[in-house]
Amino acid sequence: MKASDVRGFTADQLKDELAKLKKEQFNLRFQKATGQLEKSSRINEVRKDIARVKTIARQKAAEVKA
């Protein structure tokens, strides 16, 4: 997921995307613990996607206040 794609989302879409990514992160951690995870790099990708979404949500909130 690119930051430019995320910037086009509304606040509600950002919340939904964040919830979806956190759920995926939980599932990936569970798969890792049980030894079923095939693509371990996906954990880092999801973690960075979560950071992107949170950063852009924070920036949008700051724009509204300013």
Swiss-Prot record:
Disulfide bonds: none annotated. One of its GO terms (cellular component) is cytosolic large ribosomal subunit. The keyword Ribonucleoprotein applies. Keywords: Ribonucleoprotein, Ribosomal protein. One of its GO terms (biological process) is translation. InterPro entries: Ribosomal_protein_uL29, Ribosomal_uL29, Ribosomal_uL29_CS, Ribosomal_uL29_sf. HAMAP family: Ribosomal_uL29. Belongs to the universal ribosomal protein uL29 family. This is Large ribosomal subunit protein uL29. It comes from Rhizobium leguminosarum bv. trifolii (strain WSM2304).
